[in-house]
Amino acid sequence: MLDLYPVHNFTVEQLEYEKNTRVLQPVWDWIKNGNEHILSSPLFPPFYALSIDYTWVAVFTFIDLFLYDVPFFKNAKIQKDRVVTWDLMKKSLKLQGWNQLLWIYPMALVQLIWVPDTELPILAPTVFEMVSQLAIFFLAFDFTYFWFHYFNHKIKWLYRWCHSVHHMYSSPFAASAQHLHPFELFFVATFITTVPWIFPTHCLTYWLWFFVAQSVSYEVHIGYDFPFALHRIFWFYSGAPAHDMHHLRPLTCFQPWFNYLDRLMGYHITYEDLKKMTEAKFKKFGLYSVEDEKGLIKIN
């Protein structure tokens, strides 16, 4: 990764001034100092990304299996008639394990062999630089994945071959977020990894992007609508209810994080909208025909 702030471009006084005026400098120094050999390793990004996955899955697996009757979680559950069991999770975790063995760990090995160590900049990114870049990455992925997702549903052979794997679950939970066909996993992982290459990106911004992208992807799959959820504050953010609807009615709510494209194209729908439909419309709205889904595996 490029050193965005080469030391030779600064005088000693300028370097000290920059270090003293950058809000994120103390955070960057705390993260970096003493950990350079770990953070600079080409193995750090893939295993850091995996640690985010494992943390989300571990936390919500515990909630789903042991705290599902606690009133706070019971009230927040979106599809209250669906219970997440260990048998359901095992099927998803098994596929994730195979995907990691086939794709993630071999790619990590390739990085170890071919990718040089990361040069850790002395200076932290500015707040404006970090926030503006994260916003661009977020918008770019959300827009691009909408179309990838849309065509995966509209092109029937592509849906049957690839994306139907993710739709084995009609009631999602955190562990099902990575229940993906290897092709889809490859596309998503590659895009999340490479979108920061749009322009030179500080490694701290790069790592935070990984955290944001993966966390939002898990948040929309958790199956809970918490009172503090972002979609309750920002109308243009989809959140768990919209993606839950997508798993229940797969021809609706295609956009992964925002919803402006779904709204523009008429695919955004809520559970309240379903309740207002006539019985005839309710039975078919947003669903594939029986013929289209013939032979596809459904787990829940």
From Swiss-Prot:
Annotated protein name in UniProt: Cholesterol 25-hydroxylase-like protein
Span(s) of short sequence motif Histidine box-3: 242-248
One cellular component (GO) term of this entry: endoplasmic reticulum membrane
Family: Belongs to the sterol desaturase family.
Glycan attachment points: N9
Statement: the UniProt record of this protein carries the keyword Lipid biosynthesis: yes
Listed GO MF terms: C-4 methylsterol oxidase activity; iron ion binding
EC nos: 1.14.99.-
KW Lipid biosynthesis (keyword) present: yes
GO biological process, one term: sterol biosynthetic process
Membrane topology: Multi-pass membrane protein
Enzyme class: oxidoreductase
Cited InterPro entries: Fatty_acid_hydroxylase, Sterol_Desaturase_Related
Superkingdom classification of source: Eukaryota
Parts of the chain that traverse the membrane: 43-63, 95-115, 130-152, 180-200
Record keywords: Glycoprotein, Iron, Lipid biosynthesis, Lipid metabolism, Membrane, Metal-binding, Oxidoreductase, Steroid biosynthesis, Steroid metabolism, Sterol biosynthesis, Sterol metabolism, Transmembrane, Transmembrane helix
